[in-house]
């Protein structure tokens, strides 16, 4: 089921995460690292630990989801790890859609969010990215597409989800003919013979369901990073 598949992806992601030496920053001395790095005094430390931070999100498998009243997913695991290691508490607030989340961010109703959607706000600070940003190029098995590199997408019709870091990366760097869609359902319905480009973890999650008629043609890293964004009012925590 969905839970089993999500657990597999999280496990796989953390294996890649460990292989790339990111654990050092997120080890058992995480809070002490921040305290020392930012010269935070005992009073500020107590304030950091006493507050419950509002984490805003839109359900986005496999990164952020609510399953049996638990916040789960790849991004969620980072936040839950902070709770386990430091005792910092979060209130997870789910929004119906991206517009609602953006409105809450503009009103500073959330203290932290995962910037999968490439949201710009001067009121928030970017954390250091610890994510592996990889994309997957998919084509229908019946169409016999050939993609051997990022450059080989030049002139090809490519479908992407709008309002994502991946879309911004392709818009800025690719010479493909890009068609953007607001949601996965519409993208799959109207892509026809287009190639589809999605986050690699999204592909892994849906490979046997939504993408069962597609084959993986090519994958690579993108230079646009995923970040957690933290309210500037809590810059000491950042």
Label every model-predicted segment.
Residues 19, 23, 91, 178-179, ...:
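Secondary-structure boundary/capping residues
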Residues 38-47:
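Intrinsically disordered, low-complexity repeat and linker tracts
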Residues 17-21, 108, 191-193:
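Short glycine-centered helix-capping/turn motifs at secondary-structure transition points
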């Amino acid at each position: 089921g969905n839970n089993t598949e999500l657990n597999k992806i999280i496990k796989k992601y953390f294996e890649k995460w460990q292989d790339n030496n990111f654990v050092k920053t997120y080890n058992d001395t995480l809070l002490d690292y921040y305290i020392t790095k930012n010269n935070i005094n005992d009073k500020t430390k107590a304030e950091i630990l006493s507050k419950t931070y509002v984490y805003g999100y839109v359900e986005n498998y496999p990164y952020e989801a609510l399953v049996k009243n638990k916040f789960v997913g790849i991004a969620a695991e980072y936040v839950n790890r902070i709770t386990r290691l430091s005792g910092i508490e979060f209130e997870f607030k789910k929004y119906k859609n991206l517009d609602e989340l953006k409105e809450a961010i503009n009103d500073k109703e959330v203290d932290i969010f995962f910037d999968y959607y490439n949201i710009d706000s001067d009121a928030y600070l970017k954390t250091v990215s610890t994510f592996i940003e990889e994309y997957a190029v998919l084509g229908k098995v019946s169409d016999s597409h050939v993609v051997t590199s990022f450059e080989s997408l030049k002139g090809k019709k490519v479908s992407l989800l709008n309002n994502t870091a991946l879309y911004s990366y392709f818009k800025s760097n690719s010479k493909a003919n890009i068609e953007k869609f607001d949601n996965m359902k519409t993208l799959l319905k109207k892509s026809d013979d287009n190639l589809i480009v999605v986050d690699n973890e999204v592909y892994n999650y849906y490979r046997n369901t939504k993408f069962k008629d597609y084959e993986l043609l090519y994958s690579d890293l993108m230079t646009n990073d995923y970040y957690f964004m933290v309210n500037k009012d809590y810059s000491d925590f950042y």
